[in-house]
């Protein structure tokens, strides 16, 4: 185009060429406006998870039903299982969703390392704590083993982290 031709002929930048052309045509050269920065406010993860929990309903998860687990009181969000993750002191660190087809996702901003999903309540200081890889396994174990606490470490890479914190 014309600006490129002027820039090449005079050995200057496109911006400098545009200024020269504006001067020749007696046109004011617009000054660039600074980009308005909108402060990005990200809600704390516990607050975002609380909002998701409030939107959820209680029901039976198709994912768990396919695995043969009858658990009618699960938290569901758009037909996906909504599992809140936490630390030993009860701090909410995020959530995992599991779709009916088994696709698992962590909610954006979830802190996975050292977090787990409770499959049974932590009452006092339990004598036995069983840590499983995933939630379905944790539920199965909690139905078979009524003494103690069962935790799901979200995935294999987090098993050691959770075990070290529990110890």
Located regions from the model:
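Short linear motifs in intrinsically disordered
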Residues: 53-54, 73-75
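Non-catalytic accessory segments of DNA primases and related replication-initiation nucleases
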Residues: 1-63
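Phosphate-handling catalytic cores of nucleic-acid transaction enzymes
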Residues: 60-63, 71-74, 93
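Phosphate-handling DNA/RNA-contact segment within nucleic-acid enzymes
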Residues: 79-167
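Short glycine/Trp-rich loop-beta-loop segment that forms part of the substrate-binding cleft
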Residues: 68
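Residue-level detector of intrinsically disordered, flexible termini
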Residues: 15-16, 45, 49, 74, ...
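Secondary-structure boundary/capping signal
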Residues: 13-14, 29, 71-73, 149-150, ...
């Amino acid at each position: 185009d014309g600006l490129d031709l002027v820039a090449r002929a005079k050995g200057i930048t496109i911006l400098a060429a545009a200024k020269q052309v504006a001067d020749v045509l007696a046109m004011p050269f617009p000054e660039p406006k600074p980009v308005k920065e909108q402060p990005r406010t990200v809600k704390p993860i516990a607050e975002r998870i609380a909002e998701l929990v409030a939107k959820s309903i209680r029901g039976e998860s198709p994912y768990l039903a396919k695995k043969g687990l009858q658990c009618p009181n699960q938290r569901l969000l758009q037909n996906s299982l909504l599992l809140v993750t936490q630390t030993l002191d009860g701090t909410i660190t995020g959530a995992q969703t599991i779709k009916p087809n088994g696709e698992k996702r962590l909610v954006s901003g979830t802190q996975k390392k050292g977090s787990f999903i409770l499959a049974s309540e932590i009452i006092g200081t339990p004598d036995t704590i069983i840590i499983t890889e995933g939630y379905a396994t944790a539920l199965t174990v909690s139905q078979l083993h009524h003494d103690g606490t069962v935790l799901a470490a979200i995935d294999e890479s987090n098993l050691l982290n959770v075990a070290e914190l529990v110890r």
